[in-house]
């Protein structure tokens, strides 16, 4: 029963761990295992998650949302703010944190509207927020875990990375804007009532986390050594805000470790390594998009990066590959679970809307890629 519960709660970690264990039968553990682990990626990942958890704990993002909503007067303005928050914030705070923060916030806001408006807007807006977070996050190395990993692996500079993904981000933003206008084509004035965020923020903690976030940026830009920033964040959180350490997603870090071991072992199995390299050669984008549909894009990025050095194609493929199935990006499950918990009768409708809209977005963006 316990193993079933663990699998249901952490399916990706469970599968990654099983794959690592199975691969160890073919390549018995030895000193080379340590060389599989990308400690820089793990340290940056932990650092970012700890800083974001600290800022969320101080309701920084909720306050930002309330401030922006204070200026909304129509359903279109409301939709643009709620979706825009996810699109733009995900570039810096990751797609996961964006959805964890702003999807529950959306329920709170829409519950203050009349029933007919809420019914019309709820599912489309949450669906748009999910797509917005996944597509907004692809513009920067900080936006999602696979970008962070592939950016470090590729040795690209920040400007090259942003320019690589900028066309897809612009197209995504235009598509979301068109959807928002269409959704609110029978626009009406609304009144959004605002409630104060419960607790007063600790301004010293917010300033501290702001400084630590800048340190994370400097590490990503390869200005600061990752070890120093990791140690500083760990020590600061431990002594200044210990509960934050309990809100870090350690399962994601363990998933990375398990996948590093699995991929490292596969690379030492010559027959499999040669086969996968042949499949990938010249088809990196398509293979990574397809792999993401089944494994989700983070495992796909880590797996395929061991068998090609065309990291630009992998970045495009795994970012676009976050569209499609519900598990193509694990961040999408955050929104689905929220829908299932808050309006369980609508989860089937949401799933259908999510799948159709994701396929449409994926088809258009893949068409844009094919034309480049």
Task: Enumerate the language-model features and the residues they cover.
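C-terminal transmembrane helix pair
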Residues: 162-173, 286-372
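Hydrophobic transmembrane alpha-helices that form the pore/transport pathway of multi-pass ion
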Residues: 88-138, 302-316, 344-349, 369
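Interfacial loop-to-helix junctions that mark the boundaries of transmembrane helices
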Residues: 3-9, 30-41, 156-168, 198-202, ...
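Structural signal for alpha-helical transmembrane segments and their membrane-water exit/capping regions
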Residues: 3-32, 42-59, 181-186, 215-243, ...
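Flexible interhelical linker loops that connect adjacent transmembrane helices
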Residues: 2, 66, 182-210, 242-246
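Membrane-core helix-loop-helix motifs of multi-pass transport proteins
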Residues: 117-184, 190-195, 336-367
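Membrane-interfacial loop-to-helix junctions in multi-pass transporters
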Residues: 39-41, 70-83, 113-125, 203-207, ...
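Transmembrane helical segments that form the transport core of multi-pass membrane transport proteins
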Residues: 36, 58, 62-65, 211-309
């Amino acid at each position: 029963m316990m193993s079933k519960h663990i699998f249901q709660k952490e399916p990706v970690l469970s599968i990654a761990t099983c794959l690592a264990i199975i691969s160890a039968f073919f390549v018995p553990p030895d000193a080379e295992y340590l060389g599989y682990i990308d400690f820089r990626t793990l340290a940056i990942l932990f650092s970012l998650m700890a800083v974001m958890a600290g800022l969320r704990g101080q309701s920084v993002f909720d306050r930002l949302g309330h401030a922006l909503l204070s200026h909304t007067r129509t359903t279109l303005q409301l939709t643009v703010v709620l979706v825009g928050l996810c699109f733009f914030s995900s570039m810096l705070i990751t797609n996961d944190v964006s959805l964890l923060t702003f999807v529950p916030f959306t329920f709170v806001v829409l519950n203050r509207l009349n029933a007919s408006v809420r019914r019309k807007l709820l599912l489309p807006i949450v669906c748009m927020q999910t797509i917005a977070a996944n597509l907004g996050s692809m513009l920067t190395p900080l936006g999602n875990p696979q970008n962070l990993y592939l950016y470090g692996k590729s040795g690209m500079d920040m400007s090259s990375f942003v320019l690589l993904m900028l066309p897809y981000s612009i197209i995504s933003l235009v598509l979301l804007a068109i959807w928002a206008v269409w959704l609110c084509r029978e626009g009406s004035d609304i009144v959004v009532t605002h409630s104060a965020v419960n607790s007063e923020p600790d301004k010293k903690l917010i300033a501290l986390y702001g400084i630590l976030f800048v340190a994370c940026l400097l590490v990503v830009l390869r200005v600061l050594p990752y070890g120093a920033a990791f140690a500083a964040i760990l020590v600061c959180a431990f002594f200044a805000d210990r509960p934050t350490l309990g809100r870090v997603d350690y399962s994601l870090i363990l998933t990375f470790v398990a996948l590093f071991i699995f991929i490292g072992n596969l690379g030492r199995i010559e027959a499999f390594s040669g086969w996968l390299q042949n499949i990938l050669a010249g088809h990196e984008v398509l293979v990574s998009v397809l792999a993401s549909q089944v494994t989700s894009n983070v495992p796909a990025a880590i797996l395929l990066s061991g068998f090609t050095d065309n990291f630009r194609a992998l970045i495009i493929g795994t970012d676009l590959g976050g569209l499609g199935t519900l598990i193509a990006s694990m961040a999408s499950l955050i929104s689905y679970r929220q829908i299932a918990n808050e309006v369980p009768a609508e989860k089937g409708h949401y799933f259908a809307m999510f799948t159709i809209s994701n396929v449409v977005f994926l088809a258009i963006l893949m068409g844009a890629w094919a034309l480049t």
